[in-house]
A protein has these predicted regions:
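Short helix-loop-beta junction
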Residues: 90-100
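Short acidic/polar active-site loop segments enriched in Thr and Asp
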Residues: 126
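Bacterial N-terminal signal peptides
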Residues: 6-14
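Short glycine-enriched loops at secondary-structure junctions
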Residues: 79-84, 104-107, 133-134
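Divalent-metal-activated hydrolytic enzyme cores
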Residues: 20-70, 95-96, 105-123, 137-234
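Positively charged n-region of N-terminal signal peptides that target proteins for export
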Residues: 1-3
Length: 234
């Protein structure tokens, strides 16, 4: 009798943990979603994430074994290194779904561009998303100006031209950074990085000119979890 009571108590104590585990049990992605346009797959994944309904597709053991042989990501995300904006979680994607290049403020250098070219040339990725986010500290630092210490100066140099364009558009001086200026600079920085990728020669620029490469800008809202897709510049 004591043994039965002990087992019953143990099962009751373990039940919440078991329920939680089953709630996040990974599953294979439905075939219909895998056949969708890459941007639509990202939109659907972000909708699941922001509504607390993440599916955690492609995280199971069989997926890991498949990926040990080869990877075939369906999109590339160039994003900020901010710990609050991990693309795989924000877009509710699994192992091997996204090729990700991250640096503070989405800043590009030769190594970042080489990583992008690798995904495009070797893995045949044809959809690139540049993902910025609201209240980006790297963008704010570039807006503040002044001499930056250590290697931060390289970050300021990469982001600086984009944020200064936003400042010029708003005719804003060098005083305190208003929220609307920071927001405009975040968006302009994304657009600037998109333009850098599109014009990167020879590989990326040639593919885009032939209509074989798509580069899209997006902005992430830290509170709602929603990704806003920026319209293409004409």
């Amino acid at each position: 009798m004591r043994t039965l009571l002990w087992l019953g108590t143990a099962l009751l104590l373990a039940a919440p943990a078991l329920q939680q585990r089953s709630a996040i049990e990974p599953a294979r992605r439905p075939a219909f979603e895998a056949a969708l346009d890459p941007l639509e797959r990202l939109r659907l994944g972000n909708q699941r994430f922001q509504h607390g309904q993440a599916a955690h597709f492609n995280q199971e053991r069989d997926r890991r074994l498949d990926l040990a042989r080869a990877q075939h990501p369906f999109a590339l995300v160039v994003g900020c290194a901010d710990s609050r904006v991990p693309p795989e979680i924000v877009f509710d994607q699994g192992l091997g779904d996204l090729f990700v290049v991250r640096c503070a403020g989405e800043a590009l250098d030769d190594l970042a561009l080489a990583s992008i070219e690798y995904a495009v040339q070797e893995l045949e990725v044809r959809t690139i998303v540049v993902l910025g986010h609201e209240r980006c500290a790297a963008v704010q630092m570039a807006l503040a100006g002044g001499e930056l210490p250590g290697h931060l100066r390289y970050l300021g140099r990469a982001i600086g031209p984009h944020v200064e364009e936003a400042r010029a558009r708003l005719a804003s001086g060098s005083g305190p950074i208003a929220p609307e200026l920071l927001e405009a600079a975040v968006v302009q920085n994304v657009r600037g990085v998109v333009a850098e990728i599109e014009s990167s020669e020879p590989l990326l620029a040639e593919l885009r000119q032939r209509g074989e490469l798509r580069v899209v800008g997006a902005r992430y809202d830290l509170e709602s979890g929603a990704v806003e897709w920026l319209p293409a510049r004409r």
